């Protein structure tokens, strides 16, 4: 089969992707299913783009892009449900990219009664429960200061002008009149949030705090405007950052976001127009829903549309999921490598149908964890071998290789083990974030998208990374 795709670039436009036949020639995992397009207007400029989609988009225009997000994992059991009575919650979130306008997304997805938000504000956070003077912005919903979310429904605020820096803290304050149960909640925030004394303190410079919580109730996304795109990190507790130090933003997606803002590409540019939205949920699974009340969320199969497709500006996603499926399998409910591979293929197909590149991450070691067994380790190794094969994912992130003990590959490197033999510590999460190849995420309009320099591999945007040419035989 011969595949040839000459393409012209209009001024100020970049080509992202559309389905193309897979090349029949062998390829390496690092190549994924990338294609090379030739720029027109008489120029032979080679663009190395992520996987197999091609449609024109004007990346010079502003658009909404997720800068922060969380996957709701409720509802909790009634006895464990947090309640708020005529109180203000001030929720702290850490941005990945910046912008000049901002909006929030709320959710009553798991509620059984209407959720009334009496008032909502957003501001830059100074420290603790205090906000930066002059940055407080009241939020409206369809022009109204309050909003009522029916059971199962989300709500998107109207946009407001606010200069939001990258890698900064925002404070989202929600006034909850009456008595409200936090049924839609992200239970493992690894971030201190604040609950006020009774009253509406959404605009207060310093919140009069009654108690603190380590969860994010009702808030699921913060978006900013910019000529940017988003990466969704989809996974379980290891993506969620379980056992990282609270209030330090040491989850591996946080480290990826820092690198995108600060690490220069081979030509000296920054890949800093990519937001990172963390959709990890502790205890989450690929194939099945965990026990009710565990706050472990619906399966990846069930929540994919909500947590990936509905994310503003999503263009890429990483997928690290399956260790809880393996660990919780039993003789009565076995989970095989083939079961997980079939689930991965579903996620890949659904993402590709919407033009989203999918990068598979290997499963990290778990020997010594409570649900470990030698038989389950065989399944993990088989899954990782399939992921590394590069046959179906658009690229591979080898977290297993980065975190395992070379002298005992079934275990975490001791320096990276949080102590439960399942989750990394802060150093382990940093190593994972630093191990993500930035060349997987092509800068939008950056110098990475350029003609080959002398000595570069033909068709490659990064020295030393071999990519397929524009014609296959």
Where is each model-derived feature located?
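N-terminal export leaders
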Residues: 16, 28-41
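Surface-exposed amphipathic alpha-helices with a cationic face
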Residues: 344-352
